[in-house]
């Protein structure tokens, strides 16, 4: 991964969706012009924005096959990562405890992937990379 940089690696998926919509909106035309990009028309397009998110590890795989909708997942991740809430605390506020435990387990099991990924531009208090580390051999 020589020279890689994960520019949007610290953004939640729902934020990326909103950012893509904004980039193609009229309100972004002036910014696009200042960056030397076409200041009119579609840059990202509905075909890309409408494609279901996927890790693309196997044919026809979609994130929704194994993860909740991002309107549910992103607030849960924010609570776990940025607000340091435990699955037990989240269950006291109406979150399904089994879902919170499952997501926390997925985070732990995917730590090795984050160590292999390119550096992330830090945008939040607890970005993956510099602000978030778990032991690679963590169980749970």
Model-predicted regions and their roles:
Residues 1-140:
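ATP/NTP-dependent adenylation/nucleotidyl-transfer catalytic domains that generate, transfer
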């Amino acid at each position: 991964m020589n020279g890689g940089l994960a520019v949007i690696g610290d953004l939640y998926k729902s934020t990326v969706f909103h950012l893509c919509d904004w980039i193609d909106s009229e309100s972004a035309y002036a910014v696009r012009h200042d960056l030397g990009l076409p200041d009119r028309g579609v840059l990202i397009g509905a075909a890309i924005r409408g494609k279901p998110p996927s890790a693309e590890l196997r044919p026809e795989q979609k994130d929704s096959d194994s993860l909740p909708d991002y309107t549910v997942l992103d607030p849960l991740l924010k609570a776990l990562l940025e607000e340091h809430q435990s699955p037990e605390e989240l269950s006291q506020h109406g979150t399904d405890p089994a879902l919170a435990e499952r997501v926390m387990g997925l985070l732990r099991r995917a730590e090795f992937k984050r160590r292999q990924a390119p550096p992330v531009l830090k945008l939040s208090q607890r970005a993956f990379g510099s602000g978030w580390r778990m032991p690679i051999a963590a169980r749970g």
